[in-house]
Amino acid sequence: MSLDIDQIALHQLIKRDEQTLDVVLRDSLLPTNAVVEEMMAELHRVYSAKSKAYGLFNEQSELADALKRSRKGDEDFLSFSRAATGRLRDELAKYPFAEGGVVLFCQYRYLAVEYLLISVLSSCHSMRVNEQLDLSTTHYLDINRADIVARIDLTEWETNPESTRYLTFLKGRVGRKVSDFFMDFLSAAEGLDTKAQNRGLLQAVDDYCADAELGKNERQAYRQQVYSYCNEQLQAGEEIALQVLAQELPKLGEKDFQQFSAEQGYALEESFPADRGTLRQLTKFAGSGGGLSINFDALLLDERIFWDAATDTLTIKGTPPNLRDQLQRRAGSK
């Protein structure tokens, strides 16, 4: 992995009681060694693999102003990180779910792009056995479960300040979104809506097929081609590029897919990240609720699975063998 650490600082937030969140600040940057490089490579890998939301700084963002000063050399990176940790403590203390953790600031390069990653990492307890087979307790950073993380694409931010996607962050699931306080700390707002872009793509594909008056099987085959390309991009960690997608798809009528989507006003970006859950709708129907969970290939609709809209009834002809076996055993036990 070609990851080069430029500067890295660690500080700590310690929760003393329900009302007190103390700050412990380092007096120097963390020296870069093999252990630090391994930790950052793992954090970068874990973060890159997770689904992220996109954002941008508000005009009055204190963090953005401080970061600009640091980038210009008016303030050193350590001072920037110490002041930012203090602001993070003040923001985090407002919330009942506030917990302590190790606060990490790392400026690094990956594939010719400069990033600033900010994270609050939890410290976990575990057990270890030494060479003498003695047992002792140990602490480790729970990087795999890190959910308070934001990353700023410094290259994008400085070369394209009007971008709505140079800042990415994870969304938490504890009470009020954990990400909310982090966004307040960053003084940032959500930018590019990845799910909306993917939903717009699906709608454009359906409308393009309808405009060409494709039959059911032809339409589903077209959706499958779209899904294959998008899924390949997702697996490779790359974005969906409309121009490339249009080149891979058969042209329907006088306009290719990119021309059609541009003229119809779907407001799709030239490229955007793939959303796994949304893209799955190209090839499958899925839903759950009221104790029922259903998932089936789109090709089965009107073949083995029929939906009556008037009565909201789904009829399935031919059940999966394992389900049929369970039903038969339950019926036989009555």
UniProtKB/Swiss-Prot annotation:
InterPro entries cross-referenced by the UniProt entry: Nucleoid_associated_NdpA
Plastid found in the keyword field: no
Compartments in which it is found: Cytoplasm, Nucleoid
GO molecular-function term, one example from the UniProt record: single-stranded RNA binding
Primary subcellular site in the record, as a coarse category: cytoplasm
Assigned GO CC terms: bacterial nucleoid; cytoplasm
Keywords recorded for this protein, A-Z: Cytoplasm
Similarity comment: family membership: Belongs to the YejK family.
Cited NCBIfam families: PRK00378.1
Designated name of the protein: Nucleoid-associated protein YPO1262/y2922/YP_0879
Organism encoding this protein: Yersinia pestis
